Amino acid sequence: MSKSPLTLQMPSLPDPVPVVLNPATTALLIFDVIDHISARQPICKEKMVPAISQLLVRARKAGVTIAYGTRAANMSTWLPEVSPASGDIKIENHAQDRFYHTDLDNALKAKGITTLILTGWKVSGSVTYTSVGATLRGYTVVVPIDATLDATEYEIVIGQFQILHQNSSNATNEPLKTRASTLSRTDLITFK
């Protein structure tokens, strides 16, 4: 097989920004941090899981709504560091967009949630598609770049680029732009 002469240039991304979130109207969503994915993806367990775990502890302490999404067969295989607690929302999804054919939107709106923090595997898949579904439904979205990764640097950058440039584009990464997505980092997220 011959090599392609095509060389792709990575799109540039703005720096992650600090955000201050109201715990009463914010939900932390965690996608696919399960045994078989983590076993195949070292970056998942080594970098992403510790970031999610630390954010999850702070979110629980602040009273943030917590929701989990994965396929039905995987619901019992969450890594212990980020596993669901009693009362957390659990969505058995059928597609990358966690809103597609699920009751996630109803569950969040019943709790008065307006802002979502999207975390988990993977930024170019579930997180990107759910960010589109969320902004179409009127949510403001925060994506902490250390808490949602992918198999390659290319997929990470493309996922983040798509998140900022979908629907209500936020190409400059304006913090908490309404009905759009913001790139942040777990240490830049404050609950107040």
Predicted regions, residues:
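Short hydrophobic beta-strand that contains or immediately precedes a catalytic carboxylate
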Residues: L29-F31
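A cross-domain feature marking catalytic cores of carbohydrate-active enzymes
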Residues: V33, Y68-R71, I145
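Active-site-adjacent betaalpha module
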Residues: S2-A27, Q54, K61, A73-K192
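A short alpha/beta connector and helix-capping loop motif
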Residues: A24, Q41-A59, G63-A72
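Short acidic, Gly/Ser-rich segments with clustered Asp/Glu that frequently serve as metal-coordination loops
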Residues: I34-R40
